[in-house]
Amino acid sequence: MLIANVAAQSRRAAEVGAEVLAAGGDCVDAVIANTFTLGVLEPWMSGAGGGGAMVLYRAKENRVEVIDYGMRAPDGLRLEDYPLTGGAASDLFPWARVKDDRNLHGPGSIAVPGVVAGMEEAHRRHARMPWKDLLAPSVKLAGEGLLVDWWTTDMIASSAADLRRYPASAAAYLLDGLPPNAQWGIRSVVRMPQDALKATMAQLAAAGPRDFYEGDLARSIADDIQAAGGALSVRDLAAFRAHLREPLRIPYRGGTVYATPELTAGPTMARTLGLLQKALAPAQGGPDAVAYAAYAEALQAAYRERLKDMGDVDGRRALGAEAVAPSC
């Protein structure tokens, strides 16, 4: 009997992944279904407009691989349009601040999305179930609308000032210019319509992942962004591909930790573990105050190095001929 776990911040998304496994899907099928479901249930941190990387362990082959689908800057982006103004950005990451935060929100902040290409590559390599079946839960849930609970209100309220700047964002996430909130009644349910997202997911399910980069979806995305003043083009979308990478192998206390390489958190994790291995002796029991202090010092030191030194080489990732634009 197969015993498996699916972890997600959203309980419903985890259930979708578990349902895919119960239907005979590979763990990668569950990842794909979970990814697109999260884009509906938690659109503030997930979705087809983002990017990332995944570390996969294939037990039968005893092989670890990384699928890299990090975002890339549009080819027409001009660095001079993003002057630094001093201080730290207002974003979660303390990068150097850019004038008007134009790298954080608005049409000028939009890179070439990688999530769909990443799921496409994972599906091509390992999936058992049809693409459209894995997207069906996200289509259904988008049709139900975004459930407004305290977490929804908190997340939207934290970005409401920026959402109000852009009509499309305000229409999707605000009610009369204000964040939505749940009603006081214990049985009352408030939902935000997600009709446009449902139509997008249905198109993506029916037409396949390349439609996002080369078809009707690609043209719609590029047209909307360019009309708003952004640089993303259909050419940028058509050129995007996810890539298979060798994992970063991090030796740690006699074992090996596998992580994502290059412009991800993997190198920072490697530096953190390297510092810890030197600064902290293995504990006989649980971590104590000395251990927690060592964790904090190693993380802070590694992150300072990340902010100071990590980035593209001459504006391009050193990946060979495929590197056609700076990565994000």
Residue map of PLM features:
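Internal maturation/activation junctions in enzymes
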Residues: 168, 176-178, 278-328
